């Protein structure tokens, strides 16, 4: 195994192959933070809260642990001081896990220590048990650690971690590197830290989650920001079989980790693309409420609009409204008609037998600003591509349902552009 080699942490990689992807990551980071600069502080906090919710939930899911997403979202919102969020009382465990993530990213510039790592690992296992098995918490493991799969008696060994008597020296070296000079850039350091930490495997359990938190810390240091708007955990969770396969190959290797760095940075690119979608949603939602703030609405109408503004994937119909709002269909029809009369909703196809509606983000017809509109697909994701005012090509990720409805003629172009491009038109009408 890799740790059995002399100077095993003198990792090597193909600089030309890695640098190409690193440049893509850095460019996308710059684009994301450029867009975020247009948001107010409250909107930035909401974007961060949504990202951290996904980070905490998916980082746990990678390890086979399911957390209640609404509890996580509520815990993060409360700790960040975000108001007007539907509150679901979080369990003590969820609060503890959220606390670890927030402590790490909000204090990214503080030194790492054994004590800090042990405290974080304890927070993951407050009862001292993992899957009904008692484990060592708050200290480095004192037992040999074999990473295995398969049924009892026919296990397959994937990796044997360093022996317990080596952990103190191995972790001292890791922590010194972690807090030392950055010579390769935060993106590559983030990937190396992840691989290095899980290869030491200092704790009996919780190593994967800690590795991902440490990766986020290094990215925060590189960006010099405690506000986190993208996470790699959700992308790893989508491809976790490949994740474990690459780790196993690298841990049986000789320190040449190009494959790991390439895979990791591709996941970062996916994470940044997903973050762009969240930011677009928040920008359009913010633009909508600036226009609609003075329009009188019931609490139910406001809650339902926010649900769809946040990207809930469904057509707005009286049936859907009644189901989600837990009200009668007659009440739903009255709610919707009232919003149509106030120019908050618009019927997609006037006179349709089963009418559906779209939110009016912008009262102006945006088809006058956008030409050459098409729906394209990349890696299973749909995008709206168009030319804005004959000068700038834009590409916005759209919900699969919206793409399908537009292509079938069920969703007018004006309504599609209003939903995904209002913030663009709002800030650039004088171009």
Label each region the model flagged:
Residues 1-389, 394-400, 406, 412-420, ...:
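FIC/Doc superfamily catalytic core
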Residues 428-430:
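Short, intrinsically disordered, charge-balanced linker/junction segments flanking boundaries
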């Amino acid at each position: 195994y890799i740790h059995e080699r002399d100077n095993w942490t003198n990792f090597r990689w193909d600089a030309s192959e890695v640098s190409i992807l690193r440049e893509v990551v850095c460019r996308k980071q710059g684009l994301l933070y450029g867009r975020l600069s247009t948001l107010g502080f409250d909107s930035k906090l909401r974007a961060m809260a949504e990202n951290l919710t996904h980070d905490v939930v998916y980082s746990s899911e990678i390890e086979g642990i399911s957390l209640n997403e609404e509890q996580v979202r509520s815990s993060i919102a409360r700790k960040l001081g975000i108001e007007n969020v539907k509150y679901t009382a979080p369990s003590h465990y969820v609060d503890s896990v959220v606390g670890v993530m927030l402590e790490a990213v909000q204090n990214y510039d503080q030194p790492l220590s054994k004590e800090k790592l042990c405290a974080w690992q304890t927070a993951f296992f407050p009862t001292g048990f993992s899957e009904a098995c008692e484990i060592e918490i708050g200290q480095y493991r004192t037992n040999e650690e074999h990473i295995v799969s398969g049924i009892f008696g026919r296990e397959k060994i994937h990796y044997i971690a360093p022996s317990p008597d080596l952990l103190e020296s191995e972790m001292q070296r890791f922590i010194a590197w972690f807090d030392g000079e950055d010579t390769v850039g935060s993106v590559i350091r983030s990937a190396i830290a992840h691989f290095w930490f899980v290869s030491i495997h200092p704790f009996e359990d919780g190593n994967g989650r800690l590795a991902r938190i440490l990766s986020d810390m290094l990215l925060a240091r590189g960006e010099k920001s405690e506000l986190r708007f993208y996470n790699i955990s959700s992308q790893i969770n989508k491809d976790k079989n490949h994740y474990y396969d690459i780790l196993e190959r690298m841990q049986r290797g000789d320190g040449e980790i190009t494959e790991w760095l390439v895979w990791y940075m591709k996941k970062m690119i996916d994470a940044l693309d997903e973050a762009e979608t969240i930011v677009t949603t928040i920008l359009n939602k913010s633009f909508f409420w600036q226009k609609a703030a003075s329009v009188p609405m019931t609490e139910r109408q406001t809650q339902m609009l926010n649900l769809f503004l946040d990207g809930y994937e469904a057509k707005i119909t009286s049936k859907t409204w009644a189901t989600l709002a837990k009200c009668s269909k007659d009440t739903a029809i009255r709610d919707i008609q009232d919003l149509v009369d106030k120019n908050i909703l618009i019927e997609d196809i006037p006179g349709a037998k089963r009418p559906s509606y779209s939110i009016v983000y912008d009262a102006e017809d945006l088809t006058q600003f956008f030409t050459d509109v098409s729906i394209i697909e990349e890696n299973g994701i749909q995008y709206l591509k168009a030319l804005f005012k004959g000068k700038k090509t834009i590409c916005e990720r759209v919900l699969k349902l919206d793409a399908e409805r537009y292509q079938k003629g069920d969703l007018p172009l004006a309504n599609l552009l209003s939903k995904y491009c209002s913030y663009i038109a709002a800030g650039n009408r004088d171009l």
